[in-house]
Amino acid sequence: MLHNPLVQFDIKKLIDIKVMDFDISFTNSAAYMLLASVLALTYFYLAFSNPRLVPSRLQISGEIIYNLVTDMLNQNVGSKGRKFVPVIFTLFVFILFCNLFGMIPYGFTVTSHIIITFALAILVFLMVTIVGFVKHGMHFLSLFLPHGTPLWLAPLMIIIELFTYLARPASLSLRLAANMMAGHILLKVIASFVITLMIYLKFLPIPLMVILIGFEIFVAILQAYIFTILSCVYLNDAVNLH
């Protein structure tokens, strides 16, 4: 029997908390975000608390992730992006661990919910906007008028560029949430069919599931990378007005 593949995305209250008319209950979503944060902190603490000249495997993996983030900033923002390493690194690691937690049996994919991804996207959007105005003042608004635009075309270009800029949080959040949700739904549906096929084909369908799980892990890592590198691209607009 095929179970509803959308059940895995249900948010459930673990601790019911209400303050006046506001529901601030502790849910499975909050629990997995907290767990992902604690695990990430523990992982990098163990990786870098006692650095060695000949690094351990844990230290190597931590350095790979750190270098990946610094390379993203250097390639997209340049040397001026170094001061943003803590923010971008935290963003990438948080999304990565939340994505990977969804691959654990009976786990919960936090980033499949648009409210979570939109909150992250809004934080990026606000950071970029604040950095742009602090660094360039009102000249930051020149971002909405591409250089060399004819005067008669300027009003239309400003409207288009402004709409594109304001749409960034929506596109950034929808891309991550949609990909994570679609991948897990597909995995759930195919897994249900594989269980049925095993009645007739014994263990032959198992390699298919292993391949699909491996692909979904790749997608989880890729989506964290895409979200972060787009954040770096947007940050470049604020820092260098490109």
From Swiss-Prot:
Pfam families: ATP-synt_A (PF00119)
GO MF terms, alphabetically ordered: proton-transporting ATP synthase activity, rotational mechanism
Intracellular or extracellular location(s): Cell inner membrane
GO CC annotations, alphabetized: plasma membrane; proton-transporting ATP synthase complex
Signal peptide (from-to): none
Listed InterPro entries: ATP_synth_F0_asu, ATP_synth_F0_asu_AS, ATP_synth_F0_asu_bact/mt, F0_ATP_A_sf
Keyword Nucleotide-binding: no
Keywords per UniProt: ATP synthesis, Cell inner membrane, Cell membrane, CF(0), Hydrogen ion transport, Ion transport, Membrane, Transmembrane, Transmembrane helix, Transport
Membrane-spanning parts: 29-49, 84-104, 114-134, 140-160, 189-209, 210-230
Topology in membrane: Multi-pass membrane protein
Function: Key component of the proton channel; it plays a direct role in the translocation of protons across the membrane.
UniProt cross-references to NCBIfam families, sorted A to Z: ATP_synt_6_or_A (TIGR01131), PRK05815.2-4 (NF004482)
Protein family (similarity comment): Belongs to the ATPase A chain family.
Oligomer and partners: F-type ATPases have 2 components, CF(1) - the catalytic core - and CF(0) - the membrane proton channel. CF(1) has five subunits: alpha(3), beta(3), gamma(1), delta(1), epsilon(1). CF(0) has three main subunits: a(1), b(2) and c(9-12). The alpha and beta chains form an alternating ring which encloses part of the gamma chain. CF(1) is attached to CF(0) by a central stalk formed by the gamma and epsilon chains, while a peripheral stalk is formed by the delta and b chains.
The name this protein goes by in its record: ATP synthase subunit a
Gene: atpB
